[in-house]
Amino acid sequence: MAEDDAEKAFFQAQAMNADSVDYKAVEDQGASSDSDDYDPSKTLQDQYSASILDSKQSEIAPSSASPSDPNPPTQSIPPETDPSQPADSAYPSQTPSRADSQASVSAPASGTSVPLKTRTIGGFVVEDEDEDDAGDADYEPPAVLGVEDMNTISMNVPQQPISGNANEDTPTPDVSMDGAVQASADAKNFPNSSYTPASAAASKSDTPALLSQDMYNSRTLQSENMQDSAAATPVPDSPSTSKGRLPHDRVGILEDRIQEDPRGDIPAWLELINEHRNRNRIDSAREVYERFLTAFPFSAEQWVAYATMESELNELYRLEQIFNRTLLTIPDVQLWTVYLDYVRRRNPLTTDTTGQSRRIISSAYDLALQYVGVDKDSGSIWTDYVQFIRSGPGNVGGSGWQDQQKMDLLRKAYQKAICVPTQAVNNLWKEYDQFEMGLNKLTGRKFLQEQSPAYMTARSSYTELQNITRDLNRTTLPRLPPVLGSDGDIEFGQQVDIWKRWIKWEKGDPLVLKEEDQAAFKARVIYVYKQALMALRFLPEIWFEAAEFCFLNDMENEGNEFLKNGIEANPESCLLAFKRADRLEITSESEQDPIKRGAKVREPYDKLLNALYDLIAKARTRESQDVARLEETFAKINPDTQPSKTDDDDDDQSDSKARESMKNAQIEALRNAHAIQIGILSKTVSFAWIALMRAMRRIQGKGKPGEMPGSRQVFADARKRGRITSDVYIASALIEYHCYKDPAATKIFERGAKLFPEDENFALEYLKHLIDINDVINARAVFEMTVRKLASNPENVHKTKPIFAFLHEYESRYGDLVQVINLENRMRELFPEDPTLEQFAHRYSSPAFDPTVVRPIISPSQTRPKTAFPTEQPVSRHGTPSSRYPDASVTNSPKRPLEDFDDEMNRPRKFIRADSPLKTTQRRQLDPPKRTQQVISNQTGSQFRSQGSPAPLPRDIVYLLSIIPSASAYNAGRFSPEKLVDLIRRIDMPTSISQIPLPPSVRGLGFPEMSICLWGRLPSTTWPKTVHPCGKPTFIALSSITRVKCKRFTGWRSPYIRKPSLPPYGTYSPSLAFLISV
């Protein structure tokens, strides 16, 4: 059925005489019975609102051919062509008569310009439909598929192509439904596709069909002679209805994806190329390759695929053109490998009798190693180069001149290869070792010894580089940086970090080239920058760093080239545009004419502003598309029907209102989300204008009317173009005041106050300006007006806080106290959560000092240092002595251990009997932990049982504690470890080994033998800080002693000292220090 429709469409196209047909005749033909059999709208799957009824209705009230020309033309207008291409240009796959077959009926283009209405806002003359207010008005696109559109659909039957490639297949018949105007120079053989090239789309931008695709146009075309059309009602164009693609129209769908997102949807590009190649459409594949490589000129992978395709097709001339365009600008190992294969293919060595082919191949290898020989993956090229030299005439080790020449070439190649950190450096070194030792062992050792440091450096550097780039994805298909929090942001950040570490590693000069070969060092750094920019093409900071490195190393041309390419890749980048403008401003100081110099400096700013304004337009278009898609979704879910009066009830009305409110809420949320993005772009545009304004002020001053633009002309251009924030007015006013003391600054602030009445930042800067010119009365008036307007809206109350804070600071310093108190009262009413102390202290404080929080030192007791250990409370010496023997109820007998019951109610009933006397042997063999429990229970009372000590004490210490009396029984002075530690802390310790007196006795190799004597009742945490007073204490750090003979103790009699971990004989521990007796 589809073939029958296409055949009918073909006959209809043949019946239409393109030279003499007019729109009236077309309408009559559309109303005839023959044309009723084929209706293009039937193939659109109800995506367009136009119907056959509309086309029949147009017979009664025909519409004009053009909005600006009510009289229809008497003959068809030929399709517009791309001005960038010659008129007779056509791809080899197209026949000369194809353009005639496609020129069925074309919609006329409107060539007249429509003036825009102007109005005055805040004293400035602005356009009526400026972009600042364009979003508030509803856009009404022209009719979709009206009478003209229904009858001007081009119906093309592709003919058999005449191509240089005999293997192209014959395309299937097609009926195009996209537009009425198609450029004959750009027509392609797309089966089942309605693709229109970008050049053709640009050439028909004045037609109503294309205007219907842009819902938020920045300028609404108006014409006084425009007549009302009764053909069809304008219907908003949605993304789904703007194309009308069939499901099997794979090429058209991919083209739509590319047109919507050319820089972000790289998979669509690659799928489209594969689709053409699978269909054996080589010319179409070439065209897509050229478009892709125009957008991504440094994508080496696709250049390699493009060159491989031409090589497989034996298109050697096209292949050479690719090499001429890429080899010197794209340093890629794989691309150069393809080139070397091509050179060896065109210059066979088997039939080379003159040696010309060998010389050509050798020069090709030299050129390749010059450009990509420093790459860490270039080991294959170095290996092939060495093998190529080995295969040359002559014998290694011979005495002839050819033999000597071959030996010299091999030695030179090996010595270059082993200095580069590549994956083949180890194998090349082994081969070089065998080569030198095979010639002459004596001279070979000399050469190897000379080249060994370079080889060791290259080998270790390659290992380091592999560790850095282990997780690196060395792709040349650039990716737009994902927004933080979006899909892929972590992976992209990891790749960026790896590239930056590689660049930092190269700048660190691991191969030690900076001192010996400065040019080689710079070349390696520039090479890695170029490699990084292939993958990070859309990251402006890498372009900036590369250009800055070139400028710092006297490489002006390379730096400018980096900036130029970076701006081409990122035209919306303020960083690169500002850097480029600064370089132009610095390098053009010798230019005497300020107008020419200003034009040169302004060029990067203009490119930046154009790109930003285009982004704003695309954002508005995307917003309209999203809103239309949302409305279409709700329309499909809830179709608009007209119910009868009998079916109306309260439930239906409530459901309808609920659905409408839900739709409006989602649309409002969608618009708010887009408004945030557009607001950021508007802010960026404003600061770009500010940067341009300041640059022009430095070059041309404030300007003169009719003579020199200057900063004032930039301010006028910014206001005329729109989409600026209050920052532009603030910057212009402050330039006028600080640079020229011109009263125009106040006028600019006054006009800005009318345009931005709710901008708190502008109001704050306005107040500061009035205070600077000592106009306090107007400053207070502006303050009251701004605060009253903002406070009237509860949502804007928070915006008044910085304004209150500024005036409060001014009044507290230079105003009246009554004014200050009144301001504080108003601030308490508006901001009750702010503490009163903070408001009061703000009067007397500065950013560097606050006197209200200062606490002066009155007494030395306020600065008493903290003790290292808390002071223990003294124990009463006259307490009641406890019983010598423990309570029988808790005594743990060694014959029958004490049972532990948590529940006192379930304890078994026992009888108390007298304790049997323990023998001495049994007492000594008593379990130490249990004995400890008995002693502690004896001291603390029989009503408590021990919960267990952190660590068990030695058995001898437990026995000692069991036989000595309690400490409360002694009335003599007690040992205070805290005071002793404090005394040691105040002792001047030696800081070097020379201050330590050596002991008189020296044994062995001169190392002192020390005996460690420990005593005292110290907590274990203070070890080893005290000694028995049997000699002069001396402090020796073990870090200054290489050999220490330590005495191991077998018995300890101190109840509070645990045996430390002493180092064995002949070792030392730098972290320990001992107090010893000499």
Swiss-Prot record:
Gene3D superfamilies: 1.25.40.1040. Keywords: Cytoplasm, mRNA processing, Nucleus, Repeat. HAT repeats lie at residues 280-312, 314-345, 356-391, 405-438, 475-508, 520-552. One of its GO terms (cellular component) is nucleus. SMART domains: HAT. The keyword Iron-sulfur does not apply. Transmembrane segments: none annotated. Residues 42-55, 82-115, 151-170, 190-206, 879-894, 931-949 have a biased composition (Polar residues). GO terms for molecular function: mRNA binding. The keyword Transferase does not apply. Residues 15-209, 222-251, 632-663, 851-950 are annotated as: Disordered. Component of the cleavage factor IA (CFIA) complex, which is involved in the endonucleolytic cleavage during polyadenylation-dependent pre-mRNA 3'-end formation. This is mRNA 3'-end-processing protein rna14. The gene is rna14.
